[in-house]
Amino acid sequence: MPVTQEEIIAGIAEIIEEVTGIEPSEITPEKSFVDDLDIDSLSMVEIAVQTEDKYGVKIPDEDLAGLRTVGDVVAYIQKLEEENPEAAQALRAKIESENPDAVANVQARLEAESK
């Protein structure tokens, strides 16, 4: 089973908080890194590096430039998972052991926003 959108958002929110201090509750799929979250290019590179480490993916510089929103990163990671199901399974186990509360919080927030 692939990693869910909520699990990826929770992981990215933790990374963004660590790099920038932005509260995870502020991180939603439609938020733009530059326009909404005011993340500069240096911080974006740090977020990308930590995302690569956390999710076991490689984000080439030319792809990074096109990832403008949190949702773009989620879709990118999900696409990479579809291309490598074994890595996705290992990632799911890692995420479930690392941050189940963060995932539940994001899931509840997204459900509330969709109502």
UniProtKB/Swiss-Prot annotation:
UniProt modification remark: 4'-phosphopantetheine is transferred from CoA to a specific serine of apo-AcpM by PptT.
Domain Carrier: residue ranges: 3-81
KW Lipid metabolism (keyword) present: yes
Cell compartment(s), UniProt: Cytoplasm
Keywords: Cytoplasm, Fatty acid biosynthesis, Fatty acid metabolism, Lipid biosynthesis, Lipid metabolism, Phosphopantetheine, Phosphoprotein
UniProt keyword Glycoprotein present: no
List of residues that carry O-(pantetheine 4'-phosphoryl)serine: S41
A molecular function GO annotation: acyl carrier activity
A single BP term in Gene Ontology: acyl-CoA metabolic process
Other observations noted: Was identified as a high-confidence drug target.
Family recorded in the similarity comment: Belongs to the acyl carrier protein (ACP) family.
Protein name (database record): Meromycolate extension acyl carrier protein
Provenance organism: Mycobacterium tuberculosis (strain ATCC 25618 / H37Rv)
